[in-house]
Amino acid sequence: MSQQETHGFQTEVKQLLHLMIHSLYSNKEIFLRELVSNAADAADKLRYLALTNDALYEGDGELRVRISADKEKGTVTIEDNGVGMTRDGVIEHLGTIAKSGTAEFFKNLSGEASKDSQLIGQFGVGFYSAFIVAKKVTVRTRAAGHKANEAVLWESEGEGSFTVDTITKASRGTEITLHLRDEEKEFADEWRLRSIITKYSDHISVPVEMWQEGTPERDGPDGEKIPATEGYWKVMNKATALWMRNKSEISDEEYQEFYKHISHDYTDALLWSHNRVEGKQEYTNLLYIPSKAPWDLWNRDRKHGLKLFVQRVFIMDDAEQFMPSYLRFVQGLIDSNDLPLNVSREILQDNHITKAMRTGITKRVLGMLEKLAKDDAEKYQQFWAEFGQVLKEGPAEDFANRERIAGLLRFASTHTGSAAPTVSLDDYLSRMKEGQNKIYYIVADSHEAAANSPHLELLRKKGIEVLLMSERIDEWLINHLTEYKEKQLHSVTRGELELGELEDAAEKEAQEKLAEESAPLIERIKAALGASVADVKVTSRLTDTPACVVTGEGEMSSQMIKLMQAAGQPVPEVKPTFEVNPAHPLVSRLNDLQDEAAFADWSNLLLQQAQLSEKGSLADPSAFIKLMNQMLLANLK
């Protein structure tokens, strides 16, 4: 009995269908790669479920994907005998996009076809790619373990809606028929389909078959009879797990196509590593570094991790237990000989085998990046532009590998004079001055604010390099990366400048003398500013600026306060140390003022200027403007 229903596509599906047809027209053949990839996944899922319920095979354990075409009708059919779908499953998977961050994805689309095609590729179009070439798509499917009369028919022309009906289907699995548009009839040609399968699906471990026509009986060249042959389903791909083959047998093109298969990325991977580990644990891993960051890299709900196989049997996607969060951009798989076939996420969580494999894989990825940085600096900069901020999470997460991760970090620097983050900590160490025992850095809201900070004045004068940090994550990073190769990282905006041997005896003596001579002025400023500052001192770091504010050692920096406030976290009140430069004309004129009210106003103005320079904002900008106008008016009289 028919149970036909009509459903409207989810809004995002309508958008995606429209975008695909208009943005992916230059690479139409990927529809076959996507549909074959889905069919192979369905076979993998059935193989996994059958581990605990062999009856799901229904006496047919030879899993495969079959592709056929009808030139006259203008159709292409992709059929598998995998896990299949129920009616509810069809409505869920073929009518909606069940992905977190979908709305954010659509916001990122620009309307420019070339850029959008990359984003859509990262999003993973899967089944919907059929509509790139088809005016209508028909799906017949039956879930493994369900009765023949519980099969489902799904049809749509890819516009606003789709129909679902109950049908009878003897065999389990899914059959997708594409009714090609008139201008896409080339894809009904068998040789065209074969070339696409060879190009995109050679690496898939499930056999991909096409019908090979038989030949009638015929006469041979010497008059002998050549017997007729029957038609048969011919395997068109190598149908072996690519990662189990020898590296020497696998071409770069095959590695890249396999990457696209597991990642659903349209762009090539930046680099990869394929290894077989033997010893206490035996496993194979194939790891890829993408060339582009996924659009949802910063989405907290985004799943990440490797595909897990046990003895060539697919177990799960997104096995995050094998990869730390700061390497969540890594794609690939791991195939273990030691884990049980019935392994679950819970078992993986506290498993000593898992922990040993995670340690090994993490070291492997860090090694890949170290080699890339050493061998191809330009390519490493490409990686850094995409994933550098994520890697900066590493020192906080992975104490054991903190030094290795630190060596992979890149920063802007006063040495290069550029905003590009190209300087490694090893580069910095190689240029340190004789007697220098600290790595100096500054964290600010922007590169310009860091590069032009008054806190750098003395260091610039002495030719001491300073690392310039301006990304949101930098303050978090620096709280967990306090030294590198026994050299302490020292903020130029926190506590004493501590130049050590870089400051000679004459300079120290002159500084002490200036502080002594300026003691009365310092006391007056302290009295004028009162509780708004923690302390007032003569500066040792300024040469051209009248004053600056400094965070005390152990106090929360202004950047960290901003991060905490942005996250809605309570922050303690932090009072700055106010450093003044008595050699600056403004400060020396201040010292001459006898009117204490005017002295207090000028002191407050200098303090707020320094805070504005340091933080980029003030707690009460209106009060600052009012005071400034008052001072201007007084001096215009």
From Swiss-Prot:
Residues 346-562 are annotated as: B. GO terms for cellular component: cytoplasm. SUPFAM superfamilies: ATPase domain of HSP90 chaperone/DNA topoisomerase II/histidine kinase, HSP90 C-terminal domain, Ribosomal protein S5 domain 2-like. It comes from the Bacteria. InterPro entries: HATPase_C_sf (IPR036890), Heat_shock_protein_90_CS (IPR019805), HSP90_C (IPR037196), Hsp90_fam (IPR001404), Hsp90_N (IPR020575), Ribosomal_Su5_D2-typ_SF (IPR020568). CDD domains: HATPase_Hsp90-like (cd16927). Keywords: ATP-binding, Chaperone, Cytoplasm, Nucleotide-binding, Stress response. It is found in: Cytoplasm. Molecular chaperone. Has ATPase activity. Belongs to the heat shock protein 90 family. Homodimer. This is Chaperone protein HtpG. The gene is htpG.
